[in-house]
From Swiss-Prot:
Belongs to the HMBS family. It catalyses: 4 porphobilinogen + H2O = hydroxymethylbilane + 4 NH4(+). It comes from Staphylococcus aureus (strain bovine RF122 / ET3-1). Pfam families: Porphobil_deam (PF01379), Porphobil_deamC (PF03900). This is Porphobilinogen deaminase.
Length: 308
C-alpha cells in the first residue's frame, strides 16, 4: 500500500478523531504509512458568527474536498454531522466506522437536572436543533448562543452567565473527558440527535480502488444503514442549517431499522415528528420525510429558508 495522506481540520477534536481512525486502520494493516495534513477551513476561521447565518455545515468540508480533488490528500475523516447530504461527484464516503454515543450531553454549572432548572435559566448551545427542542419541552428556559471548541465552551460555562450548556457526547468522549463532568446524557425524547451525530464519514476519491479496499475492513454496515436513513431524510427535507432538523435511526435485533425524523421551528412552538420501521434505509428516510411533508413540515422549511 502506498503512503497515505489524511486531511484534517486543525481543531483538537478533528486531529484526535483523525489519529484515532488511523490507529484503527493500523490495527488491521500494521505496516501502513500515514501522515496527517492539517487544513484550515472557512468554518474554523469564522468564530464570531452563528454557523447557520454564514453558510452552514459545508463550511467545514469544502476546502478539504478541494484537496481531495487536487490529490493533495487521499482521504478525510469528517464528523458525519458536518457533511452535507449530497457528496460531490468524484468523491464518496469510503466507509462509516463504529459510532460513538450519538446523544447530547447536558452539563450544568451546579449539576442541577434539566427538569429542575429555575425559570429563566440560560442554556448555551450553538445549534438550532438543540435550542428548539429544549424550548419545546421547557419554554420557561432561555437559549443563548455559544461557539468555540469544547474547552472554550466549558470555560464559558464557568466564567459567563450560562447556567448550563449542551454538547455532543461523542466529542467529549473522543477527547477523553470523563463522564464526571456530564450532569446527564439526554434521551431521545428530550433531545433527538443531529443527523449522523456520533458517526464519522471517511471521504475519498470514488476511483481509489486500493484505498476503498482498505477502508472496507473497518466499515460498520449497521451504522452505515442507520446514517443512510438519517442522511436520506436530511436530503429529502432539503434541511439546511436554518432549520431545526433531527433524525435518529437504530437497528433492532430483528435487523429492522427504526427511524425518527423531526422538524421544528426555532422557537420550539411548531413540531413535526414521525417514527417508522423498515429494512431499506433509503426508502425509510424518504417515507418519513413524505409523512412530515404531509403534516406540513415543508412549509416551515420553505419559510425559514426564505428568511435567510
Amino acid at each position: 500500500m502506498r503512503k497515505l495522506v489524511v486531511g484534517s481540520r486543525r481543531s483538537k477534536l478533528a486531529l484526535t478523531q483523525s489519529q484515532q481512525f488511523i490507529d484503527k486502520l493500523k490495527a488491521v494493516e500494521p505496516n501502513l504509512e500515514i501522515e496527517i495534513k492539517e487544513i484550515v477551513t472557512k468554518g474554523d476561521r469564522i468564530v464570531d458568527k452563528q454557523l447557520s447565518k454564514v453558510g452552514g455545515k459545508g463550511l467545514f468540508v469544502k476546502e478539504i474536498q478541494h484537496e481531495l480533488f487536487e490529490k493533495n490528500i487521499d482521504m478525510a475523516i469528517h464528523s458525519l454531522k458536518d457533511v452535507p447530504s449530497v457528496i460531490p461527484e468524484g468523491l464518496t464516503l469510503g466507509c462509516i466506522p463504529d459510532r460513538e454515543l450519538p446523544f447530547d450531553a447536558y452539563i450544568s454549572k451546579t449539576h442541577t437536572p434539566l427538569s429542575q432548572l429555575p425559570e429563566g435559566s440560560i442554556i448555551g448551545t450553538s445549534s438550532l436543533r438543540r435550542g428548539a427542542q429544549i424550548l419545546s419541552k421547557y419554554p420557561n428556559l432561555e437559549i443563548k448562543w455559544i461557539r468555540g471548541n469544547i474547552d472554550t465552551r466549558l470555560e464559558k460555562l464557568q466564567t459567563e452567565d450560562y447556567d448550563a450548556i449542551i454538547l455532543a457526547a461523542a466529542g467529549l468522549r473522543r477527547m477523553g473527558w470523563s463522564d464526571d463532568i456530564v450532569t446527564s446524557y439526554l434521551d431521545i425524547d428530550t433531545l433527538l440527535p443531529a443527523i449522523g451525530q456520533g458517526a464519522l464519514g471517511i471521504e475519498c476519491r470514488s476511483d481509489d480502488e486500493e484505498l476503498l479496499t482498505l477502508l472496507s475492513k473497518v466499515h460498520n454496515d449497521e451504522v452505515a444503514k442507520c446514517v443512510t436513513a438519517e442522511r436520506t431524510f436530511l436530503a429529502e427535507m432539503d434541511g439546511s442549517c436554518q432549520v431545526p432538523i433531527a433524525g435518529y435511526a437504530t437497528i433492532s435485533d430483528q435487523k429492522e431499522i427504526e427511524f425518527t425524523g423531526l422538524i421544528m421551528t426555532p422557537d420550539g412552538k411548531e413540531r413535526f415528528e414521525y417514527t417508522m420501521n423498515g429494512t431499506d434505509p433509503v426508502e425509510l428516510g424518504k417515507k418519513v420525510s413524505n409523512k412530515l411533508k404531509e403534516q406540513g413540515a415543508y412549509e416551515i422549511i420553505k419559510r425559514l429558508n426564505e428568511q435567510h
